[in-house]
Amino acid sequence: MIEYAVLDGRDAEQGILDDFVRLVQEGGAINEHYVRDGIRRKGTKMVLARIEEIIVGVAALKVPLKVYRNGIESEAKSGHEISQELYPFELGYVAVSEHHRGDGIGKALVNKVVELSDGHGLFATTSHPAMKESLLPGAGFKPVGTSWANDQNELLQLFIFSA
């Protein structure tokens, strides 16, 4: 049975943080340093999916820095405004272990983060096909702006969820 837990990122034990980072790194899109810093930022909530105490999926409700938000809004990236007032949070670090993909864990994690936003808007960026094509649209996120290439030459898309 899959159990879901929510933790404040600043209160997470080192072992849990390491497992969280490991799963995100398996997806390959985000530098470990950024994940560790992002999880420890004030207001960030970690969502964990566990089977028999083993973490098999993760996601986070993030509180993005203004410089990060401004970068995404720039014409070189999405070219779409994501104001702090309308979209105070970001859905991020969604990852599911390889052996449990296709079990609905990713969908449940995305929905849990939407619930944690408590009626506030969210944004997300992704290059992952399943996130772009089904998980985010299925949770009510809409693609906006233009796509752009990241440092690995993957095509990123900005999505917004309006409360």
Regions of interest found by a model, annotated:
Residues R50-E53, T126-P129, S162-A163:
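Short, flexible beta-strand-to-coil junctions
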Residues T44, N153-F159:
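Short hydrophobic/aromatic beta-strand or adjacent loop that forms the aromatic wall/cage
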Residues H128-Q152:
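Conserved active-site alpha-helix within GNAT-family acetyltransferase domains
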Residues L48-R50, I54-Y93, R101, N150-E154:
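Conserved acyl-donor/pantetheine-binding loop and adjacent beta-alpha core of acyl/acetyltransferases
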Residues K62, I160-A163:
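Short beta-strand-to-coil "C-cap" segments at the C-terminal boundary of structured domains/repeats
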